[in-house]
Amino acid sequence: MLGRTLREVSSALKQGHITPTELCKKCLSLIKKTKYLNAYITVSEEVALKQAEESEKRYKQGQSLGDLDGIPVAVKDNFSTSGIETTCASNMLKGYLPPYNATVVQRLLDQGALLMGKTNLDEFAMGSGSTDGVFGPVKNPWTYSKQYRERSRQDAQEDSHWLITGGSSGGSAAAVAAFTCFAALGSDTGGSTRNPAAHCGTVGFKPSYGLVSRHGLIPLVNSMDVPGIFTRCVDDTAIVLGVLAGHDPKDSTTVNDPVKPTTLPSVPDVSGLCIGIPKEYLVPELSSEIRSLWSQAADLFEAEGARVIEVCLPHTCYSIVCYHVLCTSEVASNMARFDGLQYGHRSAVDMSSTEALYAATRQEGFNDVVKGRILSGNFFLLKENYENYFVKAQKVRRLIVNDFVNVFGSGVDVLLTPTTLTQAVPYLEFIKEDNRTRSAQDDIFTQAVNMAGLPAVNVPVALSSQGLPIGLQLIGRAFCDQQLLTVAKWFEKQVQFPVIQLQDLMDDGSLVPENGKLTSGSLTQ
């Protein structure tokens, strides 16, 4: 049951094949069994069981709230959850109990979803590995998969070479990949949903900016932050998006126009579409395996009758630097609220002045990565630097936006790109580089989309020669999220990404792949 799609489980609940309480207990048991992944910061067992009980009553009365009623979900720990600790994986917010739910959380709960817990992340979502939070790093479930152990000859008991999940929403990606929930919320500022989705073999969707409310998402970069969605298939993403999308009076950046339900065709058709391949994304650092899969994917579209053309995004080479300036500048502004007076941790050290209290509180509350980004942002915002850095970066951002406008205006429907440079790497290799360097490397294909406010989705396509997931990214026009997901659904059906084989789960029957074996895929190595 845990290996089924959200829609399939919803159907099973409606037909009485399983109850919400039984399903909830299965997921809670699996969360405990996979605790070594460190995917969750808080497991809300009592809350989830109570919600399951209420869902069960509705099913018995024939009053199901919809496809999400009784479905276990998880939420990244930078979304406010009423009465449930929300920490952003930081000492600054340890013990913080929000008095309200983020809008996206409330919309899930209003549809009967079961909140299994809050997932791990990089501190304040600043990172690309989910390794820098105060609660420790998240481990990629594929580290313990049969596919990886066999192809890389890793000892099942050897834990020194475990793989990162990507970040910053690595806990949500791991939670979905390990079957502890059927969907999870992440956040995406420069790729924080798509990056871990690629490394963990899940669908990771970033909606158009303004389609989904940010109210209750503890801000990192207000002009780029978007709630993201993790699921194990594109249809499930569409179901969740249909619940989350729409105007929110508490978030003035959300669209006012009514949003139609996100319904994808059962048999998607991409013939006649124009698929763009950005030539600037063919960088030397891109692994040969991903490069090959990218080319094969383009061939699949062409074989189906789509027109595949090379396109130019000329300002791509400036995007990482531009993103860094704008990101850290907004970080410095947003983090200023954590001062020991209004929000978060307050230093217990006896201080002689307010300034000293600020300094001690922030020294104790933030890790070095967060402090480093605050320092960078404050530098760019200094009066003598403002024009040369921040204002120029805003102008470059406009040029990057115009690049996408020109490409989509020329008749291109969707862009096809890599999501990451490489497959997931071992933790010991990842930490050889500092957080700033790693983030610049890992955001290379993803952050420009955030600056342009476009929808994008990672689709897992194949396993590498080492048995690890590789994903590709599809980018759509602004507010053409449904078209993008339709194309993604077609692509997903073509590649037939294999089911992860976690031996611990196979042994006790918690998860059995269809027909007891993996599905063969169209993209091979």
Curated annotation (Swiss-Prot):
**Entry GO terms, CC:** glutamyl-tRNA(Gln) amidotransferase complex; mitochondrion
Q: Please provide the record's keywords in A-Z order.
A: ATP-binding, Ligase, Mitochondrion, Nucleotide-binding, Protein biosynthesis
- Location within or outside the cell: Mitochondrion
One GO term of the biological process aspect: mitochondrial translation
Q: What does this protein do?
A: Allows the formation of correctly charged Gln-tRNA(Gln) through the transamidation of misacylated Glu-tRNA(Gln) in the mitochondria. The reaction takes place in the presence of glutamine and ATP through an activated gamma-phospho-Glu-tRNA(Gln).
Q: Which family does it belong to?
A: Belongs to the amidase family. GatA subfamily.
Kindly provide the name given to this protein in its UniProt entry.
Glutamyl-tRNA(Gln) amidotransferase subunit A, mitochondrial
**Originating organism:** Rattus norvegicus
The record lists the lineage as: Eukaryota, Metazoa, Chordata, Craniata, Vertebrata
Q: What gene codes for this chain?
A: Qrsl1
